[in-house]
Swiss-Prot record:
Its EC number is 2.3.2.27. PANTHER family: E3 UBIQUITIN-PROTEIN LIGASE PRAJA (PTHR15710), E3 UBIQUITIN-PROTEIN LIGASE RDUF2 (PTHR15710:SF217). It comes from Arabidopsis thaliana (Mouse-ear cress). PROSITE patterns: ZF_RING_2. This is E3 ubiquitin-protein ligase RDUF2. It is an enzyme of class 2 (transferase). Residues 316-337 are annotated as: Disordered. E3 ubiquitin-protein ligase involved in the positive regulation of abscisic acid-dependent drought stress responses. Possesses E3 ubiquitin ligase activity in vitro. A zinc finger (RING-type) spans 199-240. Disruption phenotype: No visible phenotype under normal growth conditions, but mutant plants have decreased sensitivity to abscisic acid (ABA) and reduced tolerance to drought stress. Keywords: Abscisic acid signaling pathway, Cytoplasm, Metal-binding, Stress response, Transferase, Ubl conjugation pathway, Zinc, Zinc-finger.
Length: 407
């Protein structure tokens, strides 16, 4: 008896996450693209087979998801975006990886030394564009990133962030104004010069009958040397004695523990763009942004797609504030405005075999429901324009020197 054909269901096809070593990015392969056949899986972007399936061993409680309605829209947008990219033959522009600084990971059994320190220093999350939300990056891929010099890059970015905004400062906080003003002024005498001949900040020799400021640890400094120093850090330049610092004004009844995070995109033609944000611990739950990229309908460079948006979700998937401005209330909106920082910087990857590299530009993230700091955005754009001017000026001088040699 001939078998009756089964009617295809209308359920959403299952996706699998893969890491493409050719594209150096996460990709989603749909079940109807031949993933059920062994050895037939290929990257949907480069059609290469050098890919590895990512087995997510994390529990469902640690997954960071977005609401189901948003997932359906993201899945449909993702499939349409893949079709458009295949027709145009254009390589996708963005590949977001969420990086959090200062992870509170627990030391695993048998783990010690630098391995434990590096694992707790940063937390990695990724979104393959399938609409499943942010998930922890597998250990195998994290080791590849950290082993390729990625850790040094993150450390440099963290230092820049701490010095620029003071957020997530890993060193000493500034001394309080009252502590600085209370430092006694002493007149330098021969006995002072005998015990301490020069200022440790400017290294200039003290002159008798001049005025200096004395720390509680009895070390002397010029007034115009130690005051700027203590306004940045509260420790003595010589013995690291610490003065009282200002209380943390950002701490409130909710006890929000902010941590600096970064979002990294690959740019077309080489290079990376890095956006910074704050993540927080609220009620014991990590709050992370969902960054809508070109994959799921928030593309950059396409005027009809509108501006980029950032949505914040709790670890259980509760939407804090969506891209259309509908949030959980004015209280959470106020906290978001305090946390989100619109400063974005651009890094260019240097390629020694190329005579010229692609020009860089800063990418600014915007949101309908968040008040971004216009002054910070202007400062970032000015810095980017300065970099571009230096780049084109250097190329013009190189061309002029080459033409003079030929003539």
């Amino acid at each position: 008896m001939p078998s009756t054909p089964t009617t295809p269901t209308t359920t959403t096809p299952i996706t699998a996450s893969y890491w493409c070593y050719s594209c150096t990015r996460f990709v989603s392969v749909w079940a109807d693209q031949g993933t059920t056949t062994v050895g037939s899986v290929a990257c949907p972007h480069c059609d290469g087979g050098f890919i590895e399936q990512i087995n997510d061993s994390s529990s469902a409680a640690t997954e960071l998801t977005i609401p189901a309605s948003t997932e359906v829209r993201s899945i449909n947008n993702n499939r349409r975006s893949v079709i458009r990219r295949r027709r145009s033959g254009r390589r996708p522009s963005f590949n977001p990886v969420i990086v959090l600084q200062g992870g509170a990971g627990e030391r695993e059994e048998g783990e010690e030394g630098d391995a434990a320190r590096d694992r707790r220093a940063f937390e990695f999350y990724y979104d393959d564009g399938s609409g499943s939300g942010l998930r922890p990056l597998p250990d195998s891929v994290s080791e590849i990133l950290m082993g390729s010099g990625f850790e040094r890059l993150l450390e440099q970015l963290s230092q820049i962030e701490a010095s620029a905004t003071g957020i997530g400062r890993s060193g000493n906080p500034p001394a309080s104004k009252s502590a600085i003003e209370s430092l006694p002024r002493v007149e330098i005498s021969d006995c002072h010069i005998g015990s301490e001949a020069n200022c440790a900040v400017c290294t200039e020799i003290f002159e008798t009958e001049t005025e200096a400021r004395e720390m509680p640890c009895k070390h002397l400094f010029h007034d115009d040397c130690i005051v700027p120093w203590l306004s940045i850090r509260n420790s003595c330049p010589v013995c690291r004695f610490e003065l009282p610092s200002e209380p943390n004004r950002r701490s409130n009844n909710n006890e929000e523990d902010n941590a600096v995070g970064m979002t990294i995109w690959r740019l077309p033609g080489g290079g990376f763009a890095v956006g910074r944000f704050n993540a927080a611990m609220r009620d014991g739950e990590r709050v992370l942004p969902v960054v809508l990229t070109e994959m799921d309908g928030g593309g950059i460079g396409n005027s009809q797609d509108g501006p980029r948006r950032i949505s914040w979700v709790r670890s259980h998937g509760t939407l804090e504030s969506d891209s259309n401005g509908t949030g959980s209330g004015s209280g959470s909106g106020g906290r978001l405005r305090r946390m989100v920082r619109g400063m974005v910087s651009l890094m260019r990857r240097v390629r020694p075999n190329r005579s010229s590299s692609s020009s860089s530009a800063a990418i600014s993230t915007s949101s309908d429901n968040l008040d971004l700091n216009i002054e910070v955005e202007s400062r970032v754009l000015d810095r980017s324009n300065s970099v571009m001017r230096r780049y084109f000026r250097r190329n013009r001088s190189n061309r002029d020197s080459s033409s003079s040699v030929l003539h």
